[in-house]
């Protein structure tokens, strides 16, 4: 018997989140189906199965990690052949028996935010960068998650913003995150950029004085969020380039379908505005 860790990539669009649920298609449900078919896991309890991140419906991943104990050899290509096109195991690592997958040194999230070409001129990127700096360090993130969090304090290591034509790419690195925290951080930064919030509002949100929330933040849409990486002490994954390429092929097909819809929408807008 040995403990293994597997890095899982998936396109969350057609999943009802990671965690298995009766009558819903989930990432975990598909993985466990294949593991049981191949006798890698008989049941999750005896295999001491666990996962680093239980992502919500619509959220994607290139770096979620699962771990379990098995006496079977792991053949990634064989397992991927049994998995649907929108999930692939892209890495494997042998880990100590006592490895705790839920406690990485850092987690990295990426958020993809399209910029409307009709509102782009109203966006102040400079103010957004200033607002992002407010999140660095350890803060009380109660206003960026559920109100009843037992321990709302979290440490953010880095927040970065890349502008790529009509898309903003946020990269947020932290030790751990609360539910909806990243998506609400993105909302607040975007609202600073559009002048709906002031930078001082961000600072006030990070210092909640009472249970009443003076600004109610809506989480940014789930389909822009990617759980992109986990870093563990002294653990190095052996990645499968073949598995990554199979997922890329699937994404290229999906991209062209959505690109056609987007171009058609833009043309409709131009026609209607004539």
UniProtKB/Swiss-Prot annotation:
The keyword tRNA processing applies. It comes from Methanosphaera stadtmanae (strain ATCC 43021 / DSM 3091 / JCM 11832 / MCB-3). Its EC number is 5.4.99.12. It comes from the Archaea. It is an enzyme of class 5 (isomerase). It catalyses: uridine(38/39/40) in tRNA = pseudouridine(38/39/40) in tRNA. Belongs to the tRNA pseudouridine synthase TruA family. This is tRNA pseudouridine synthase A. Substrate binds at residue 109. Formation of pseudouridine at positions 38, 39 and 40 in the anticodon stem and loop of transfer RNAs. The keyword Isomerase applies. The active site is at residue 56. One of its GO terms (molecular function) is RNA binding. One of its GO terms (biological process) is tRNA pseudouridine synthesis. The gene is truA.
């Amino acid at each position: 018997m040995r403990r293994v860790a597997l890095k899982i990539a998936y396109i969350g669009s057609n999943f009802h989140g990671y965690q298995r649920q009766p009558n819903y298609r989930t990432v975990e449900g598909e993985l466990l189906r294949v593991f049981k078919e191949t006798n890698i896991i008989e049941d999750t309890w005896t295999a001491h199965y666990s996962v680093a991140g239980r992502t919500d419906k619509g959220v994607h991943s290139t770096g979620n990690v699962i771990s379990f104990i098995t006496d079977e050899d792991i053949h990634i290509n064989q397992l991927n052949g049994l998995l649907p096109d929108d999930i692939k195991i892209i890495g494997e690592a042998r880990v100590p028996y006592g490895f705790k997958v839920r406690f990485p040194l850092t987690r990295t999230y990426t958020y993809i935010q399209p910029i409307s070409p009709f509102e782009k001129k109203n966006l102040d990127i400079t103010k957004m960068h200033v607002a992002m700096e407010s999140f660095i360090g350890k803060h009380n993130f109660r206003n960026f998650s559920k109100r009843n969090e037992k321990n709302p304090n979290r440490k953010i290591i880095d927040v970065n913003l890349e502008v790529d034509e009509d898309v903003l790419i946020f990269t947020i690195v932290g030790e751990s995150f609360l539910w909806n925290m990243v998506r609400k951080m993105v909302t607040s930064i975007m609202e600073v950029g559009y002048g709906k919030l002031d930078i001082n509002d961000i600072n006030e949100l990070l210092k909640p004085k009472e249970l009443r929330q003076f600004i109610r933040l809506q989480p940014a849409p789930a389909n822009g969020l990617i759980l992109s990486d986990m870093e563990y002490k002294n653990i190095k994954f052996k990645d499968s380039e073949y598995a990554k390429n199979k997922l890329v092929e699937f994404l290229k097909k999906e991209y062209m379908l959505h690109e056609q819809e987007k171009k058609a929408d833009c043309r409709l807008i131009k026609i209607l505005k004539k």
